[in-house]
């Protein structure tokens, strides 16, 4: 709810800055009060959105809820479904008043998030644009597939389908689509059961072992960039 944070406006780095670039500011980094002081500084503000929080009352992902497009209230993520003056409504109104202080350029990391942000009543009148996250092509480039398979103890023959996310069982990452598509593929092409495998990386990847009609090779969570390159 952004009620605690650190006042950065007194820092030399802030005073010397020509532009202020915000990213993810939650969990005690910046409060709405701190953000207000930043906006009052008169410095140009760019805010890169890594989720929906800047454009909603309190949620980081609105899922099916569209209240943020008009005004947050009766939040489905609050116990009992919230009410007209619930936490989401109060924070929404605070943000709406706060954003009037200065123009903000909101940058999203995907076109999907750009569309969501542009539909928010909070960001009306502000610039919203999309700049996808860059990829280090010196690191992430094609490698020897056979060596990679050997490294992860994967079959040298056959096709491998790759699926990964921070948490495999998070429905927002498409796990249901993966299961459904694999079942459909096995139904229409049963011969693939002996030549296709599914490589999964991310937390709880082991849980997919018995949910797919193909062999599953679970690599668990991967944090090392060089390991990701090999995958």
Model-predicted segments: where are they?
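A conserved, positively charged/aromatic
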Residues: 37-40, 60-64, 96-102, 123
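A short helix->loop->beta-strand "cap" motif at the edges of active sites that frequently abuts
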Residues: 40-45, 102-104, 125-126, 194-196
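Short N-terminal targeting/anchoring amphipathic segment
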Residues: 9-30, 44-50
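A short, charged, and often flexible helix/loop element on the N-terminal side
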Residues: 1-6, 24, 79-87
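Short hydrophobic "strand-cap" motifs at the C-terminus of beta-strands
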Residues: 109, 131-134, 163-167, 201, ...
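Donor nucleotide-sugar binding/catalytic pocket of nucleotide-sugar-dependent glycosyltransferases
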Residues: 54, 69-145, 151-154, 160
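Conserved donor-binding/catalytic core segment of Leloir-type glycosyltransferases
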Residues: 155-173, 179-183
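Nucleotide-activated donor-binding/catalytic signature segment of Leloir-type glycosyltransferases, i.e.
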Residues: 189-229
């Amino acid at each position: 709810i952004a009620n605690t944070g650190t006042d950065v406006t007194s820092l030399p780095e802030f005073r010397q800055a020509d532009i202020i670039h915000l990213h993810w500011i939650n969990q005690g980094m910046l409060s709405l009060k701190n953000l207000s002081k930043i906006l009052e500084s008169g410095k140009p503000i760019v805010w890169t959105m890594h989720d929906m929080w800047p454009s909603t009352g309190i949620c980081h992902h609105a899922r099916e809820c569209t209240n943020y497009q008009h005004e947050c209230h009766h939040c489905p993520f609050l116990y009992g479904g919230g009410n007209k003056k619930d936490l989401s409504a109060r924070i929404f109104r605070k943000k709406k008043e706060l954003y009037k202080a200065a123009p903000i350029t909101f940058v999203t990391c995907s076109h999907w998030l750009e569309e969501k942000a542009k539909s928010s009543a909070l960001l009306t009148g502000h610039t919203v644009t999309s700049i996808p996250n860059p990829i280090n092509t010196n690191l992430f480039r094609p490698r020897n597939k056979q060596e990679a398979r050997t490294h992860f103890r994967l079959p040298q023959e056959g096709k491998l389908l790759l699926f990964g996310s921070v948490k495999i069982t998070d429905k927002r990452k498409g796990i249901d689509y993966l299961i459904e598509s694999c079942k459909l593929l096995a139904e229409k092409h049963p011969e693939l059961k002996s030549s296709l495998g599914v490589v999964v990386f991310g937390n709880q990847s082991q849980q997919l072992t018995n949910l797919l009609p193909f062999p599953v090779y679970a690599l668990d969570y991967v944090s090392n960039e060089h390991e990701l390159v090999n995958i």
